Amino acid sequence: MSQDPFQEREAEKYANPIPSREFILEHLTKREKPASRDELAVELHIEGEEQLEGLRRRLRAMERDGQLVFTRRQCYALPERLDLVKGTVIGHRDGYGFLRVEGRKDDLYLSSEQMKTCIHGDQVLAQPLGADRKGRREARIVRVLVPKTSQIVGRYFTEAGVGFVVPDDSRLSFDILIPPDQIMGARMGFVVVVELTQRPTRRTKAVGKIVEVLGDNMGTGMAVDIALRTHEIPYIWPQAVEQQVAGLKEEVPEEAKAGRVDLRDLPLVTIDGEDARDFDDAVYCEKKRGGGWRLWVAIADVSYYVRPSTPLDREARNRGTSVYFPSQVIPMLPEVLSNGLCSLNPQVDRLCMVCEMTVSSKGRLTGYKFYEAVMSSHARLTYTKVWHILQGDQDLREQYAPLVKHLEELHNLYKVLDKAREERGGISFESEEAKFIFNAERRIERIEQTQRNDAHKLIEECMILANISAARFVEKAKEPALFRIHDKPSTEAITSFRSVLAELGLELPGGNKPEPRDYAELLESVADRPDAEMLQTMLLRSMKQAIYDPENRGHFGLALQSYAHFTSPIRRYPDLTLHRAIKYLLAKEQGHQGNTTETGGYHYSMEEMLQLGQHCSMAERRADEATRDVADWLKCDFMLDQVGNVFKGVISSVTGFGFFVRLDDLFIDGLVHVSSLDNDYYRFDQVGQRLMGESSGQTYRLGDRVEVRVEAVNMDERKIDFSLISSERAPRNVGKTAREKAKKGDAGKKGGKRRQVGKKVNFEPDSAFRGEKKTKPKAAKKDARKAKKPSAKTQKIAAATKAKRAAKKKVAE
């Protein structure tokens, strides 16, 4: 144990420490063959019953997590020595599946026979095999490490007197038998929640019991209910949390204000959307006499009310983030905090954490300091109001006269910060997002495009600056904290993206490792193209997903060496942990001893941060998937009434079985199946992202403008089928390049910008982001998958829904 480099860490956690996981893995790596538990106990100098029991538990935990394999000879071995991998099962509605292994580019194929030993969502240990006759690399399931134990949502049916549930998630390709005494009063076609009592095997069917009946009226509310349960999102407040918040008052206690910097006279304001209910950030800036600005970013002091290890903290950590569905919000914190005590509502005292910064006239962050304060927001402003004020709206300028000059100064600061972002090469995404407008029945009445103006971007730049300051502060002090990490795109993703661009007459410079600046200039060069939104989406897909991690590797998209989330502790748990770390450091500077402070500061260990990073990243992905499910259902529900109508759109994706079309202004995608095209054999060119008719020569390519008719809506699969009316070839290389635009300058150009690339930049990009020489992209292998027709169940449900609506409409008339 004395050679264990993690001995001190283990001694901090356990009174009678045992070798760390890392040391056990290192020991087995040096060993030529697997070892039994008794052999490991001798070789690792384990003594006494307590240590032996600790070793037994640790080995079992390492086996559960896939770090070790327990062989038939009762020995522990390294999975890589046995050519085994750990991964997550991804099911398919046709019975087969895939194994997603972290760190591998391609998923491994699981045959329908292998899928009988596991279900979608299981974490398994598997053995990679050779390729099948279709060239797919297969895998054999060795053991289920962590079975999917969550509840399953589906519809209840009866057939020949036997009750069963068909899962709503098509990746669960099995029915669940329900014994007669476990039905809970569900009737034919009802949406129910099932708990498995017997998992499906090669010889037996799945058996379960109904634990909740959601009803048969499938609407927006039920779509949210299904998503919450399918993705295991916590939505019920535990009784202990209810009890903890029951004693909270609406006003900030006077004793809480003591010892804080008083900023109540500083004209801080909140700027949010019209429908926002929780306000966690306020801003103010003023011009410095010598040039540049002083910027105050005040953030709600959630950490004062949510203390570590309390029921409230445990539930906030469990949720990880607030989940914003189109029609409702599942908050991370109870409403008394999120919309009350922690929300920076106007004209009331609130506790806050402040990041006060100095910014040079060139937009360079020259200084920052953090402190705890008390504030009173001088106004609750909206993006629309601020934009109109900046545009000269006289009525609003009179209404908010005392604040106008401060808002104009914020706008001046924004313009400098925006230019500084361009100089360092940060990528600016101008995404078009859909906003659903609901009617009285909570169905989509229409879909509108959200408009981003300088007020949105102004707040965004202020928040980025505060996040950078927070990241630098904890990093300089070497304090364990969660950084917001955006890794560089993989070489394969870059090659694939560059191939698509080449087909469209575009180019991404930078070789195999393009810099953020290369992506930013590409986006600027295509800004005026009709397919700009599609290209931006493809660019995003070519990049890696941002995560939380205590190991700082920089933020590629923003071209920053250090970045963390500090500005939204009401709705993001990583921000709350960062506030605690900053408070701990501030108290430590004043000579405070111990891991906790009087106002909610806390010192986390690196081990805690590693676990939190994984959990918070998972919670973010979980929320994204759930909201996407509901949005897809709402879009399908909206399109049910559009069957037979004709729309214009653009080809957004091409596959071997057809192409997807994104409808103009609606942001809704549907499939034109290859079988519905002209009578011809179509070949899929994956590199060129196009379908080509062998006889006619007709080509359908990414970016082509098309006119389509809505043929069918598959509510079960959340998919929409189109048929092609006409198509128009997308022009190649439309729009000036960034270099050509720069020659003409900015004068008289609507929305145009000249990218200034100088030697001195605002924030020096990580050296890992620097480019290399260009390499020719490799051609990808062809793919030819077939689409499936809607299931009989789907057609039944869709027909019943349509008939029900028609009947309601008739009664109303």
UniProtKB/Swiss-Prot annotation:
UniProt organism field: Escherichia coli (strain K12)
Task performed by this protein: 3'-5' exoribonuclease that releases 5'-nucleoside monophosphates and is involved in maturation of structured RNAs (rRNAs, tRNAs and SsrA/tmRNA). In stationary phase, involved in the post-transcriptional regulation of ompA mRNA stability. Shortens RNA processively to di- and trinucleotides. In vitro, exhibits helicase activity, which is independent of its RNase activity. RNases 2 and R (rnb and this entry) contribute to rRNA degradation during starvation, while RNase R and PNPase (this entry and pnp) are the major contributors to quality control of rRNA during steady state growth.
Gene: rnr
Molecular function GO labels: 3'-5' RNA helicase activity; 3'-5'-RNA exonuclease activity; exoribonuclease II activity; RNA binding; RNA exonuclease activity, producing 5'-phosphomonoesters; RNA nuclease activity
UniProt-recorded name of the protein: Ribonuclease R
Record-linked NCBIfam families: 3_prime_RNase (TIGR00358), PRK11642.1 (NF008648), RNase_R (TIGR02063)
Subcellular location: Cytoplasm
Cofactor dependence: Mg(2+)
RNB domain ranges (all copies): 260-587
One Pfam family matching this protein: RNB
